[in-house]
Swiss-Prot record:
Cellular location(s): Plastid, Chloroplast thylakoid membrane
Gene assigned in the entry: ndhB1
Membership in a protein family: Belongs to the complex I subunit 2 family.
Functional note: NDH shuttles electrons from NAD(P)H:plastoquinone, via FMN and iron-sulfur (Fe-S) centers, to quinones in the photosynthetic chain and possibly in a chloroplast respiratory chain. The immediate electron acceptor for the enzyme in this species is believed to be plastoquinone. Couples the redox reaction to proton translocation, and thus conserves the redox energy in a proton gradient.
Summary of subunit composition and partner proteins: NDH is composed of at least 16 different subunits, 5 of which are encoded in the nucleus.
InterPro entries: NADH-Q_OxRdtase_suN/2, ND/Mrp_TM, Ndh2_N
Native source organism of the sequence: Gossypium hirsutum
Major enzyme class: translocase
UniProt keyword annotations, A-Z: Chloroplast, Membrane, NAD, NADP, Plastid, Plastoquinone, Quinone, Thylakoid, Translocase, Transmembrane, Transmembrane helix, Transport
Topological relation to the membrane, as annotated: Multi-pass membrane protein
Transmembrane annotation, as ranges: 24-44, 57-77, 99-119, 124-144, 149-169, 183-203, 227-247, 295-315, 323-343, 354-374, 395-415, 418-438, 484-504
GO CC terms: chloroplast thylakoid membrane
An example molecular function term from Gene Ontology annotations: NADH dehydrogenase (ubiquinone) activity
Enzyme Commission number(s): 7.1.1.-
This protein's name: NAD(P)H-quinone oxidoreductase subunit 2 A, chloroplastic
């Protein structure tokens, strides 16, 4: 009898929870319509994978790409709508969040064709790979719109879990297993540190979890200048630092870049930084509004360390992927300048613009590396010597992307850095901008060193990998080359296109 009553109570409670969730989805679902499209795409992928054979593999790519394109379309149709808070304050929809969601969707859309040929050659499980990519994209999108501490913690965990699985996808590779283990352990530690910082913020605000309500709670409790807030700031900065991978939170980055499959590295190298930048901007700007001097100082230290260490250590690397890992550490130092400048001097607009260019530059470089790796089986920088004599198109594409990463005019990277540094200079960050300029010159050195190898014609310097290099047939690798061409064109956009891009970015500020 007691068991029967308990069972009835359990059913009633479950029904209430289900009805409440259905009510939220029914009335608030329109606010997450782009995310719902991805969820529907995930369900379709699962159904097709569980009920069909290998002949339906093209459908898996088609559904994944279509879901991402439809999600981008839904975001664009929702452009310039009034900011809205939904799901009981857990999620906020505004133009600022949506432009970061657009960047994440753009990264994923370019990464899927980039990975098609690689997956087929390495005989990796295709359906699971696409599921993890879409789920990580979904987690990144929710992180961009997260409006409370719980969602800010759960969303990146969704992204991180998929990242761990993707980085260890080649289970038979010892380097991949080592990278995944290191990534998982450091990711778990950083999540614990982040939650500990949230607990200090939660307690100091009188039990508030929504970002704006935390500010009101700190005012009511008079704790906005307390030691507890300083402790929360330090722990949260360290936790977010793992996602952004600035120095000194960068130890996992080179190993994960080197050990993971190259398309996975391309995906993680941009999406994680875009999502973490969106989250960091909102966390520092809203709950820590009264501690702006403190978090400005912390971020300045991280930016300086990242720009110096990332670019100096990149010079010594012999692996192309490890070199790009340290290069990305230096690049995030430039992005942090935009976060520090903030809304007052166009810092956010310059950060968003540089992020857009960084996506094209980085993914274009990785597309070239994927193609070269599939045709030669090597990642060593020395093995790129003389590539221009065998494949001028690939060598020229790689050279343009590297020059754009270095910031040489008239490529897109130059104008992105120019606007970012100019905003920092106007904000009075003279020392930070000077470090950025000097380290940009250093980065140009090691990029030009690679380009010199690409263009060399000396037989004694050309390795057997390039001597035996054979271009694939015209119809092969076309998906990778499509992504590469799109990224190369975007990386070489002249400065005349900067003004409309910056104007659009400025309209997204909250």
């Amino acid at each position: 009898m007691i068991w029967h009553v308990q069972n009835e109570n359990f059913i009633l409670d479950s029904t209430r929870i289900f009805m409440k969730a259905f009510h939220l989805l029914l009335f608030d679902g329109s606010f997450i319509f782009p995310e719902c499209i991805l969820i529907f795409g995930l369900i379709l992928l699962l159904m097709i994978d569980s009920t069909s054979d290998q002949k339906d593999i093209p459908w898996l790519y088609f559904i994944s790409s279509t879901s991402l394109v439809m999600s981008i379309t839904a975001l664009l149709f929702r452009w310039r709508e009034e900011p809205m808070i939904s799901f009981s304050g857990n999620f906020q929809t505004n133009n600022f969040n949506e432009i970061f969601q657009f960047l994440i969707l753009l990264c994923s859309t370019l990464c899927i064709p980039l990975s098609v040929e690689y997956i087929e050659c390495t005989e990796m499980a295709i359906a699971e790979f696409l599921l993890f990519v879409l789920t990580a994209t979904l987690g990144g999108m929710f992180l961009c719109g997260a409006n409370d501490l719980i969602t800010i913690f759960v969303a990146p965990e969704c992204f991180s879990l998929c990242s761990y699985l993707l980085s260890g996808y080649t289970k038979k590779d010892v380097r991949s297993n080592e990278a995944t283990t290191k990534y998982l352990l450091m990711g778990g530690a950083s999540s614990s540190i982040l939650v500990h910082g949230f607990s200090w913020l939660y307690g100091s605000s009188g039990g508030e979890i929504e970002l704006q309500e935390i500010v009101n709670g700190l005012i009511n409790t008079q704790m906005y200048n307390s030691p507890g807030i300083s402790i929360a700031l330090i722990f949260i900065t360290v936790g977010i630092g793992f996602k952004l991978s600035p120095a000194p939170s960068h130890q996992w980055t080179p190993d994960v870049y080197e050990g993971s499959p190259t398309p996975v590295v391309a995906f993680l190298s941009v999406t994680s930084k875009v999502a973490a930048s969106a989250s960091a901007t909102r966390i520092f700007d809203i709950p820590f509004y009264f501690s702006s001097n403190e978090w400005h100082l912390l971020l300045e230290i991280l930016a300086i360390l990242s720009m110096i260490l990332g670019n100096l250590i990149a010079i010594t690397q012999t692996s192309m992927k490890r070199m790009l890992a340290y290069s990305s550490i230096g690049q995030i130092g430039y992005v942090i300048i935009g976060i520090i400048v903030g809304d007052s001097n166009g810092g956010y607009a310059s950060m968003i613009t540089y992020m857009l260019f960084y996506i094209s530059m980085n993914l274009g470089t990785f597309a070239c590396i994927v193609l070269f790796g599939l045709r030669t089986g090597t990642d060593n920088i020395r093995d790129y010597a003389g590539l221009y004599t065998k494949d001028p198109f690939l060598a020229l594409s790689l050279a343009l992307c590297l020059l754009s990463l270095g910031g040489l005019p008239p490529l897109a990277g130059f104008f992105g850095k120019l606007h970012l540094f100019w905003c920092g200079w106007q904000a009075g960050l003279y020392f930070l901008v000077s470090i950025g300029l000097l380290t940009s010159v250093v980065s140009i050195y090691y990029y030009l060193k690679i380009i010199k190898l690409l263009m060399t014609g000396r037989n004694q310097e050309i390795t057997p990998h390039v001597r035996n290099y054979r271009r694939s047939p015209l119809r092969s690798n076309n998906s990778i080359e499509l992504s590469m061409i799109v990224c190369v064109i975007a990386s070489t956009i002249p400065g005349i296109s900067m003004n409309p891009i910056i104007a659009i970015a400025q309209d997204t500020l909250f």
